Amino acid sequence: MIKLTPPMGWNSWNTFGENINEKMIFETADVMAESGLRDKGYEYLVIDDCWSLRERDENGRLVPDPEKFPHGMKAVADYVHSKGLKFGMYSCAGNMTCAGYPGSYEHEFVDAETFASWDVDFLKYDYCYHSPILHGKYLYRQIGRAHV
């Protein structure tokens, strides 16, 4: 499907950097809905880097930082969706994100399943700490296959 306008919305990085939490995201969703931004086409609310723990769980899954997101990402997605917005998250093609959290390299399929279980609508996919042997074309194709 070809969209007439690019995806428009808000991303946590430029405002909060690594200092993000559930309360800030809920408040941002409220402002986007109540200020009219959503009605003007700004429909995506995206949580950028630094939302997870620094280690995956025993099943290789990403784990939201319970201090920042005590109710988990599914609850955050549900709240964002309740405001008529789409929920986006961040990951990276490398083995680490740009800020040093777990990246999706060699975990593309489990990460896609995890994001789907949280009802994520949009993925911002960065390119830090990537394999020097593999190039972006392969890495982006891999995450694309995982999300199909």
Name each region found by the language model.
Residues 1-13, 45:
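N-terminal hydrophobic targeting/anchoring segments and the immediately downstream early-domain regions
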Residues 9-14, 58-62:
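Glycine-/proline-rich flexible loop or hinge segments
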Residues 14-20, 66:
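Second-shell loop/turn segments in exported
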Residues 24, 28-133:
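Aromatic-lined carbohydrate-binding/catalytic grooves of carbohydrate-active enzymes
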Residues 76, 142-143:
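Aromatic/hydrophobic pocket-lining residues that form π-stacking "cages" and hydrophobic walls in ligand
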Residues 133-142:
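A short alpha/beta connector and helix-capping loop motif
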Residues 146-148:
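Conserved small/polar residues in nucleotide/adenosyl-binding loops
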